[in-house]
């Protein structure tokens, strides 16, 4: 089958890393990018140099209004560049972009993302949680995608992509009565470098490099949308910490069936080596956050950091590159839904 043709709206952290993931995986063909705030020569620079993930190990240039991205042994991507503020005006159809990654963080509802369909896109994948679009987590519920009816979908959040595979394995094997999640989360672009105003959430406006900032997250509750049996059983919060990338989930849960920590490790390792390979990983190494920069997995279970109080009450720890792991799942989701076309 021919590779799915992809457009990217918004060339920020996720937009650029989705393109990197697309080049690495060589499973989709990126044919168009839209960003009203970035000129084409600036796109070349931003794509080539990355403070977190390093310099792009390939070539990137521009010719007219096309980006040319290539890597040895991989397909070249010739990418039409648009600079439209209104998503309805982007000529996705003219570029042949059937699948659009909506990564501006602005058009996250069905109504708003629907504008891409007017420009000729066939499907829209929102790279953020959505209030009303169906959410899919690759490895957990992606097979529930309905090609006939699901035209605008969400890839959920990076944290939900970390938590859901872990929660699925634990719930399938031992049953989760209830659980609380904490994510210790790297800074993101929405935070302030120094103290500043921040709408209703005053703490969010404090300096990102100076503080551990308690914050809300819908990631745990969203697992209930992805795994209906867990609906109403999980909630959580976040601590934003002064690191540039890589976050870690702490899931504290009560189990229906008694299980030793070794029992839990065995089933997670079996899933990581089997049906969830490439999504859920397992480590017994003495790792820290920087060890997972540019890791392509959604969730890396840390066997050494996880603890048990008794056979019914456990704290499970799982790492994730909140930028790159997530961006790889966006590409995987597109690859999957394209097989249903």
UniProtKB/Swiss-Prot annotation:
According to its UniProt record, in which pathway does this protein act?
Answer: Carbohydrate degradation; glycolysis; pyruvate from D-glyceraldehyde 3-phosphate: step 1/5
| GO BP annotations listed | glucose metabolic process; glycolytic process
* Location in the cell: Cytoplasm
Residues of the active site are 158 (nucleophile)
In this chain's numbering, which residues are marked as the site (Activates thiol group during catalysis)?
A: 185
Signal peptide residue numbers:
none
Which ranges of the sequence are coiled-coil? none
Q: Does the record's keyword annotation contain Transit peptide?
A: no
The record's similarity note reads: Belongs to the glyceraldehyde-3-phosphate dehydrogenase family.
Q: What is this protein called?
A: Glyceraldehyde-3-phosphate dehydrogenase 3
Q: Which organism is it from?
A: Caenorhabditis elegans
Could you tell me the gene encoding this protein? gpd-3
